Swiss-Prot record:
Protein name: N-acetyl-gamma-glutamyl-phosphate reductase
CDD domains listed in its UniProt record: AGPR_1_C, AGPR_1_N
Keywords, ordered alphabetically: Amino-acid biosynthesis, Arginine biosynthesis, Cytoplasm, NADP, Oxidoreductase
Gene: argC
PANTHER family to which the protein is assigned, alphabetical: N-ACETYL-GAMMA-GLUTAMYL-PHOSPHATE REDUCTASE, CHLOROPLASTIC-RELATED (PTHR32338:SF10), N-ACETYL-GAMMA-GLUTAMYL-PHOSPHATE REDUCTASE, CHLOROPLASTIC-RELATED-RELATED (PTHR32338)
E.C. number(s) listed in UniProt: 1.2.1.38
Subcellular location: Cytoplasm
SUPFAM superfamilies: Glyceraldehyde-3-phosphate dehydrogenase-like, C-terminal domain (SSF55347), NAD(P)-binding Rossmann-fold domains (SSF51735)
SMART domains to which the protein is assigned, alphabetical: Semialdhyde_dh (SM00859)
Function field: Catalyzes the NADPH-dependent reduction of N-acetyl-5-glutamyl phosphate to yield N-acetyl-L-glutamate 5-semialdehyde.
GO cellular component: cytoplasm
Family membership: Belongs to the NAGSA dehydrogenase family. Type 1 subfamily.
GO biological process: L-arginine biosynthetic process
Known catalytic reactions: N-acetyl-L-glutamate 5-semialdehyde + phosphate + NADP(+) = N-acetyl-L-glutamyl 5-phosphate + NADPH + H(+)
Length: 334
């Protein structure tokens, strides 16, 4: 049995990792490291987690076999290299190691990093073999997951008649996507019965999406726009993807392409009916529905995920399972 520890365990993603790893049959949860919450019991912050473990400050320990890092952007850059050098299996949930371009990283994250600070991108539906061989994984972002899975078959599939001219994405996330820290704009009084856009055209997941789909922000091969929004739900991401094709395609043709593309992906469900956030909440599933296809080549695709699971902790454990030679569904039955 593998020993596992979490660095940054007191945030929402860290709490979900804790919950899932406590019941995972192939690992033993060893240490929970946190900075601002060090010294507090897990059950004090999260009564749902009936664990007697106490959050500890992290001081560079590397006794566990596997380390998850669920820290704010920028904080993993210095912590990951020593763990990798020590031969540990590492899965980082931040954006610190996702982008190959240091220019794009600095532009969108407002932080500098070295060109070597890149790890295998942990989206098993696209990079399964690379993940199996990897020792260090950069877990995808939540918005990026909902969008990439929603359009990947069109850009990376084997139907040569499909040529994408442009993609417009509007995605609404639950408030938990903004993290656990107290902010006035995220308070109940501000967010109840409310929805608002933010970082329009500037969100840090834009270059991640473009990179994964085989293009880039600086030299795009298709038009791409992204409007992220936050709404008055706790968890979930609901994405409406409007795709412009060079040539029209029937909805049934697109649906068949998607089902073939994801036939070996246990956590992607191509639905015949409209997706809803409540159908994926508290699960590791991504639900996709081909909602409409017009005569002028416009597709409307709708996806739904749980931002804390398929968009964070669940996908991270899915990656761990593959890296350790387990069935990727282990510990993720819902």
């Amino acid at each position: 049995m593998y020993s596992v520890s979490i660095i940054g365990a007191s945030g929402y993603s860290g709490a979900e990792l804790t919950r899932l790893l406590l019941r995972h049959p192939g690992v033993e949860l060893q240490e929970l490291y946190a900075f601002s919450q060090a010294g507090k019991a897990v059950s004090e912050l999260y009564p749902l987690l009936s664990s007697d473990k106490v959050y500890k400050p992290y001081g560079g320990e590397c006794e566990s076999d596997v380390y998850f890092l669920a820290l704010p952007h920028g904080e993993a850059l210095q912590l990951v290299p020593p763990l990798v050098k020590a031969g540990k299996t590492v899965i980082d949930l931040s954006g610190d190691f996702r982008l190959k371009s240091t220019v794009e990283h600095e532009q969108f994250y407002k932080q500098q990093k070295s060109p070597e600070a890149v790890m295998t991108y942990g989206m098993s539906e696209l990079f399964r073999e690379e993940i199996i061989k990897a020792k260090a994984i950069s877990n995808p972002g939540c918005f990026a997951t909902s969008i990439i899975l929603g359009v990947a078959p069109l850009l990376l599939g084997n139907d040569s008649s499909i040529n994408v001219r442009g993609i417009n994405c509007t995605s609404t996330s639950g408030i938990s996507g903004a993290g656990r820290s107290s902010k006035t704009e995220l308070s109940f009084s501000e967010m109840s019965e409310n929805i608002r856009a933010y970082k329009v055209g500037l969100h840090q997941h834009i270059p991640e999406i473009m990179q994964t789909l085989g293009t880039s922000v600086t030299t795009p091969s298709f038009d791409f726009t992204f409007t992220p929004m936050i709404g008055s739900l706790v968890r979930g991401i609901y994405s409406i993807l409007t795709v412009n094709l060079e040539n029209p395609a029937e909805a049934e043709q697109i649906k068949a392409l998607y089902k073939e593309f994801y036939k070996e992906a246990p956590f992607v469900r191509v639905r015949d009916t409209m997706t809803e956030v409540r159908h994926v909440a508290h699960t590791n599933f991504c639900d996709i529905h081909i909602a409409h296809a017009t005569a002028n080549g416009t597709l409307i695709i709708v996806t739904a995920i749980d931002n804390l699971l398929k968009g964070a902790a669940g996908q991270a454990i899915q990656n761990m399972n593959l890296m350790l030679g387990m069935n990727e569904k282990t510990g993720l039955s819902f």
